[in-house]
């Protein structure tokens, strides 16, 4: 499958579900200062999604977990373990994050989802590298859902 590539803010996308590039969930969430997509979710959506994801315990690298969207207008948030213990994204962590998030999308029959560029922020990989890995992973997935890959751009 091939996602639509859009520019903007993931929290402004008209979709049922958004993906949050998270960590392996080993450090307690309340000790972290979320940045990027996670920081925006915390600011606009509140703490509830992070409390819920914490209850899952450690997430395997590239794993995905489904939570509510807190105060955000989505049906859910899928948190993916896009970075390893050293806060670095790998080809494996990024591609498995895409594949495992799409498994949840398909299992729950969500019709639309927006992904950030996993691994390009806290994962310390460039946007082009991360996007290339994600697009290759999407090619291995079959889905009826509409998928957007959001290149962050602040819109005034």
Region annotations inferred by a language model:
Residues 1-6, 59-62:
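Short gly/ser/thr-rich secondary-structure transition/capping motifs
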Residues 19, 78, 115:
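Conserved, mostly hydrophobic/aromatic
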Residues 16, 75, 111:
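Conserved acidic residues
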Residues 83-156:
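Phosphate/ribose-phosphate-bearing ligand recognition and processing surfaces
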Residues 49-74:
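N-terminal short beta-loop-beta anion/metal-coordinating cradle
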Residues 9-12, 69-72, 139-142:
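Solvent-exposed alpha-helices and their adjacent loops that cap or buttress functional pockets
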Residues 72-85:
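Short, basic/glycine-rich phosphate-binding loops at helix/coil junctions
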Residues 10-57:
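Short, conserved "active-site rim" segments that organize catalytic pockets and cofactor/ligand binding
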């Amino acid at each position: 499958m091939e996602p639509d590539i859009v520019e903007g803010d993931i929290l402004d996308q008209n979709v049922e579900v958004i993906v949050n590039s998270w960590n392996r969930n080993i450090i307690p969430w309340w000790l972290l200062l979320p940045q990027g997509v996670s920081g925006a979710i915390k600011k606009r959506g509140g703490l509830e999604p992070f409390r819920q994801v914490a209850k899952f315990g450690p997430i395997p690298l590239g794993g995905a977990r489904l939570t509510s969207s807190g105060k955000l207008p989505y049906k859910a948030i899928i948190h993916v373990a896009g970075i390893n213990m050293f806060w670095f994204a790998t080809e494996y962590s990024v591609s498995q994050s895409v594949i495992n998030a799409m498994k949840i999308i398909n299992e729950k029959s969500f019709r639309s989802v927006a992904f950030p560029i996993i691994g390009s922020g806290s994962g310390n990989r460039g946007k082009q590298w991360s996007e290339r890995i994600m697009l290759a992973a999407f090619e291995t997935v079959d889905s009826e859902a509409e998928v957007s890959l959001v290149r962050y751009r602040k819109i005034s």
